[in-house]
Structures are given as C-alpha cells and as structure tokens.
C-alpha cells in the first residue's frame, strides 16, 4: 500500500497556484481513467476560481486548507478547512475565498 502526505501536497501545490497565472494547481492523488474512484487535490489562490462546469457524477469536496464557496445555480455554500461538502449534480463552480486546497473525490460510472 502506498501512502501520500496530503499535508506536503497542500504546501507544494499552494506554492505552485500562487505563482501560476491561472491561480490554480492540481494533482491526481488516486485514480485515473482505469478507476471508478478518482481523487484530485486542487489548490486555488485567493480571488481565483473554477468556472461553472457540468458534474462528472457523484462527487464530494473536502476542504484541506483555507475557505471556499461552492455555487450551483442560485445556491451557494461556504466551507472552511475540515469541512466536507457533497457536490450537487447540477452545474457548479468553486471560488477561493482565501488561498485554499480541496480534495475532490469523484465516482465515475460506466
């Protein structure tokens, strides 16, 4: 079994996100096209966001660092480090209220 230090990845990818013109950095922690379960660590610098997009399937978001706002239609949910959100199946987006890192877990059926 392989272990991964999420704490180390948080620091590494926050540094990358802060320096990137997009304000973001991502790293696949587990999964890929050959797996149903996919986990991606996403770092977003304060003031940046992920544009609204379609849901790929059942998904959750675990905030590892900072604070975020998840939006879907007219609804919005704020979350801080340690919070866990179930992502709606509707179109949604994610805004960094401050430098943040989240662990996105998606189950792809098919």
Give names to the regions the model predicted.
Residues 23-27, 38-55, 81:
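Conserved short histidine dyad/triad with adjacent acidic residue
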Residues 64-65, 80-81, 98:
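A cytosolic small-molecule/anion-sensing beta-strand core signal
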Residues 1-36, 71:
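A short, N-terminal "cap"/entry segment at the start of jelly-roll beta-barrel domains
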Residues 89-110:
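Ligand-binding loop in jelly-roll beta-barrel domains
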Residues 57-73:
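Glycine- and acidic-residue-biased ligand/ion/polar-headgroup-sensing regions
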Residues 73-90:
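Short acidic-glycine-tyrosine-enriched beta hairpin
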Residues 48-50, 66-71, 92:
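Short beta-strand segments in beta-sandwich/barrel cores
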